[in-house]
Amino acid sequence: MRVFHFLPIAAFCLMTGACSTGKKQAELTAGIQFANLDTTALPGTDFYQYACGGWMKNNPIPAEYSQYGSFTILAENNRKQIQGLIEELAATQHEAGSVAQKVGDLYKIVMDSVKLNKDGVAPIKAELDRLGALKDRKEVYALLGEMQKKGIVAYNVLYVGADEMNSSMNAVQSYQVGLSMGEREYYLENDEATAKIRNAFRAHVQKMYQLVGFDEAAAKKGVEVVMDVETRLAKAFRSRTELRNPHANYNKMSLEELKKNYPTFDWDAYLSALDLKDVQEVIVGQPASLKAAAEILDTLPLEQQGLYLQWKLIDAAAGTLNDAMAEQNFDFYQRTMSGTQEMQPRWKRAVSTVSSALGEAVGQMYVEKYFPAAAKERMVTLVKNLQESLGERIKNLAWMGDSTKVKALEKLATFHVKIGYPDTWKDYSTLEIKDDSYWANMERANEWSHAEMVAKAGKPVDKDEWLMTPQTVNAYYNPTTNEICFPAGILQYPFFDMNADDAFNYGAIGVVIGHEMTHGFDDQGRQYDKDGNLKDWWTEEDAKRFDERAQVMVNVFDSIEVAPGVYGNGRMTLGENIADHGGLQVAYQAFKKATAANPLPVMNGLTPEQRFFLAYAGVWGNNIRPEEVLNRTKSDVHSLGKWLSLIHISEPTRRS
């Protein structure tokens, strides 16, 4: 039986007149900015336009962005705050080897455009020459490992992460990577828009070869090699939809089995170069793509192999070299693929670089200055209330059997919650920041991160480690540790407002909390037990009922025409759509329960319920370029914000 969910926004239709008479002081208390609304729209017909139309009109996309929304604006504010912290350090001398010296010096190196342009492509010249002078196929495998340590990834990647069948322990794992355009569809699909991007990529590769000194003939030859290698890889790669099956991505092999299954691949040289020579087993994520990589490595003529690896170096280093390289890199990856019109100013790129290479060092400074203890305390209460409400929803699910409910509630009760920042900060004492070149420092930063990662191989998982920096405007659920994490960076307006009442905060950050919790029970998360192991805890009947309900959501998002002739991918975005839908419902239930004893007043003509839904929709206010719509349809597991707010509020769906 289909049950129609129309969450209670109908009252908007009766009160649109009152919505335009708020006072500024009341707006701050309510958390709703009336300038963000479009009161000419009917909320019962187009709630997204009503809630976000004013904001979209007043916030056109800046030239340096492919899309511009709440996440972007908050990230911009954070970046300005971080800029102030970093520039203060960069303005003075510090003890050599101190965090202050590393942060300040790296920023100055990235900002020094005079030196970058004077050096040109010299920082990668020796590496280019080495790759162009390969004498023996055996040396390629060691080179692949050395390059990965420096952040240059070709063919395949090895990493250390939780063993999904034994989540308390770390294991070495392989994963398909290496396509320069990111998604296999750009190599395989032949519609006009995709073909146009592919042709632009060919021109880009040729131009980049020439910028580092190749003549036209050699550059054109390089283009053909890159397209041949990456098209062959793309044909063997799993799609993003196929990658959503965690069981298919788990194929543990002993070193002996690896050598048997991929006999031409020099595993000893590769693992040794990655500082993993003692590893005796690897979890292979996608055996077919690894097989394709092994075949190409074994058969591609050595000269062509060198050309391809030179391209991977050029592609990885481009943004750290002179203006000509950085601008050409931007022209394809941002302007062509996403529609971005201008490169970000250098200071923004410098802040992003420092915040990435020395993430927790920057994060520690950030939270000390900008994250109040009261914000963490209020978040703890919100999380607790949403956890209780999700538990109540699970207990009341008519379609789920008792035995599955018991397991679901056990999993919910064991959520590991992280808020704001880690209790222990990373130690960057062994990372060297020197004044040689931007690229050399990025290589050392990547080598430092690699060493930190491989040191975990075969050791217990540290459940207190954070997978995001505190300054990040995002949140996550990690199934292998059964944790939800909300960095300090996202705990600000419009997601969280210490000056707004619960109606606003449950509608904004409350939905984000509910979203991450629901991930523990989406199409992927539900396959992991309370301990983070890939283990089926559902009865066959309950799993079937879940799949039936999930298919309804797939069908809804498949039917959305996001651009003329281009439709959403309901299967690829299923996990995020389930989390968005569940997060909204859980947050609303928690909000009603939290305010039942002391109902909130009407503010500015808005009921508490209306403020809740306006806060929710306001989070998704976003302007986006047509090119980025097409790009995200191929690459992003998240649906566009417009459809999230419209569908999850008003779309009929099976009871979840």
Question: Where are each of the predicted segments found?
Answer:
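Bacterial N-terminal signal peptides that target proteins for export
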Residues: 1-7
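C-terminal motif of bacterial Sec signal peptides marking the signal peptidase cleavage site
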Residues: 17-18
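Short, Gly/Pro- and small/polar-rich lid/capping loops
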Residues: 23-35
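Active-site-surrounding "flap" and adjacent substrate/cofactor-binding loops of secreted or lumenal enzymes
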Residues: 42-45, 50-110
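Structural recognition of the beta-strand scaffold that forms the well-ordered cores
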Residues: 46-49, 173, 483-485, 520
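Noncatalytic, helix-rich "gating/capping" subdomain that lines the substrate-entry/channel surface
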Residues: 89-381, 385
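Intrinsically disordered, low-complexity linker/terminal regions across diverse proteins
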Residues: 226, 261-264, 283, 287, ...
